[in-house]
């Protein structure tokens, strides 16, 4: 039964989502920092308000953390962070940039050939590593490359964003939403790939055709490129040994996760030991090179700034740029991102801090403490560059946001909203499998934009389908799960940056590099690929279900 508490819970949930999409920073008295209400803080504040209003209780909070209905949030986050650490440390070795240079050489001076090769490369890398590491390295590389080659950056960057997010639907570890679906619908991890591989292939091909259609003008993708010099792919492979070890460990972890899923074993029990082993290797290997005075990451970096600076220098020198002020700017905005402040700006948390002025004695003490902390950080970064470069790149903002979303949606369920939404789903589809595919798929794409990233949309729709499951056939439930998998991944290629964490990350990196992509521009160039992929992807899901059932 819907009560006043139910209405209040829904209203607070919607308001919190509004602040996720459009974050604000509330001014306060001068000596107190401004209060940001955004992706990290808005859901937590909503939980606090609902708890104070007695709209939820500790049992609901516990259910949002431990999990209900087979969905285990801690399982999802441990798995995602474990694999993210391995993927990011692999990226730090320079293997992604090396692959980009190799592909660039293969493309030569043919503009469309190079555009196609980059699309294929980014797609394959995103399948294996997930979209976040590819967005991190691929975006920075394309910014530099398009500047050097004097190309229109928007066509290349939008292609990269679409390729990375579309490819993340293949493996269950490609996106946190995939793990939510596997957990929530009890889909075997290997079966997940079997179901999504055909929709992915169709979406990827038609997405490229849509991109090619809207960028057919030579001002976006020229027929011939002015820059034809070969790039040295080996020069940016900063740690060949680390690349080999990291590739082997990541591949082994993924294969074992797929295998153990057949035996009902939680996959985080596999991924976490691999991540710990990779951490031990990183620390030991960095220590060995430090003691033996071997080049760290292949270029002898000595601190947080050194690593990023050198990586850009290698990129720009290999690309043979001659603009000195560009070099200076690139050094300052280097990748890997070395500090947590930069990561905060990437996620666009809008933390505007007004420093209060302490008394002189206190100021001296604070300055001394800060100086020691900076010196210690530089020393540790010089000793263990792999870990201290990877640490700020881990998606820590995902932790409070994901848990908060689970708790808020658990609160909606506690107040009876999931039963209401489930009833609406049944009335709209009458339990028909094909209607369910299209309704869940289209709703999934829309909700990615208006429900606080694709993670929130996936959690919400998973709960709705489960609420309606007693009146749905097993085939319809499975079809809804696959439709949601397709929608939650292509939904990131959408109208708002906040449709996914990858979108916020992508916008932040571009902002750092001095490229401003407006919300309108982002929506305009994504509209055609999104519509095409939605129609094609859901049509393939319907065809799959027709053949299987």
Task: Write out the residue ranges for each language-model feature.
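Membrane-embedded alpha-helical segments and adjacent helix-loop junctions characteristic
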Residues: 58-152, 384-388, 392, 396-478
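The feature identifies polytopic integral membrane transport proteins across all domains of life
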Residues: 132, 153-161, 165, 180, ...
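Hydrophobic residues within alpha-helical transmembrane segments
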Residues: 117, 121, 159-162, 197-198, ...
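Hydrophobic transmembrane alpha-helices of multi-pass small-molecule transporters
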Residues: 1-92, 199-200, 212-423, 517, ...
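C-terminal transmembrane helix pair
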Residues: 194-200, 400, 404-407, 432-549
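Transmembrane-helix bundle segments that line or gate the permeation/cavity pathway
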Residues: 150, 154, 160, 171, ...
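Re-entrant/interfacial helical elements at transmembrane boundaries that shape
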Residues: 133-144, 157, 171-185, 420-424, ...
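Cytoplasmic-side transmembrane-helix entry/capping segments in multi-pass membrane proteins
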Residues: 33-45, 101-105, 111-117, 121, ...
């Amino acid at each position: 039964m819907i009560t006043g508490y139910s209405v209040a819970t829904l209203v607070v949930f919607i308001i919190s989502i509004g602040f996720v999409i459009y974050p604000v920073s509330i001014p306060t008295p001068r000596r107190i920092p401004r209060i940001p209400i955004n992706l990290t803080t808005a859901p937590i504040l909503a939980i606090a308000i609902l708890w104070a209003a007695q709209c939820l209780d500790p049992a609901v909070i516990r259910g949002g953390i431990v999990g209900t209905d087979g969905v285990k949030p801690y399982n999802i986050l441990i798995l995602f962070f474990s694999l993210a650490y391995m993927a990011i440390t692999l990226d730090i070795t320079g293997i992604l940039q090396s692959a980009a240079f190799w592909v660039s050489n293969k493309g030569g001076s043919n503009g469309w050939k190079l555009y196609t090769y980059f699309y294929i490369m980014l797609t394959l890398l995103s399948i294996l590593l997930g979209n976040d590491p590819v967005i991190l390295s691929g975006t920075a590389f394309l910014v530099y490359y398009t500047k050097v080659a004097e190309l229109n950056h928007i066509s290349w960057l939008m292609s990269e964003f679409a390729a990375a997010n579309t490819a993340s639907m293949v493996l269950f570890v490609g996106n946190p939403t995939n793990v939510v679906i596997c957990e929530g619908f009890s889909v075997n991890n290997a079966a997940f790939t079997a179901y999504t591989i055909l929709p992915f292939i169709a979406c990827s091909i038609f997405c490229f055709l849509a991109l090619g259609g809207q960028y057919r003008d030579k001002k976006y993708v020229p027929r011939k490129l002015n820059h034809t010099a070969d790039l040295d792919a080996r020069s940016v492979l900063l740690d060949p040994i680390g690349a080999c070890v990291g590739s082997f460990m990541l591949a082994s972890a993924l294969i074992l996760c797929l295998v153990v899923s057949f035996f009902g074993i939680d996959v985080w029990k596999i991924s976490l030991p691999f991540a710990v082993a990779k951490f031990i290797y990183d620390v030991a290997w960095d220590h060995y090179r430090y003691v033996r005075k071997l080049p760290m990451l292949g270029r002898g970096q000595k601190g947080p700034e050194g690593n990023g600076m050198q990586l850009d220098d290698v990129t720009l020198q290999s690309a043979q740029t001659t603009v000195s002020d560009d070099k200076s700017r690139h050094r300052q905005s280097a990748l890997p991102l070395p500090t947590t402040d930069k990561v905060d700006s990437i996620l666009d948390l809008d933390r505007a801090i007004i420093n209060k002025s302490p008394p002189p004695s206190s100021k001296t003490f604070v300055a001394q403490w800060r100086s020691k902390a900076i010196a210690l950080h530089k020393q540790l970064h010089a000793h263990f560059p792999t870990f201290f470069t990877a640490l700020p790149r881990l998606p820590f903002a995902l932790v409070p946001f994901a848990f908060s979303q689970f708790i808020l949606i658990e609160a909606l369920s506690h107040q009876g909203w999931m039963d209401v939404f489930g009833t609406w789903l049944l009335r709209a589809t009458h339990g028909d499998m094909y209607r369910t595919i299209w309704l869940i798929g289209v709703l999934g794409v829309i909700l990615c934009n208006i429900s606080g990233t694709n993670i929130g949309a996936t959690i919400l729709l998973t709960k709705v389908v489960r609420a309606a499951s007693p009146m749905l056939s097993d085939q319809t439930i499975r079809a809804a799960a696959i439709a949601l998998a397709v929608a939650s991944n292509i939904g990131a290629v959408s109208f708002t940056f906040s449709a996914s964490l990858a979108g916020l990350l992508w916008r932040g990196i571009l902002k750092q590099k001095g490229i401003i992509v407006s919300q309108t521009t982002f929506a305009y160039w994504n509209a055609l690929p999104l519509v095409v992929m939605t129609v094609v992807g859901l049509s393939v899901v319907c065809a799959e279900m027709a053949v299987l059932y």
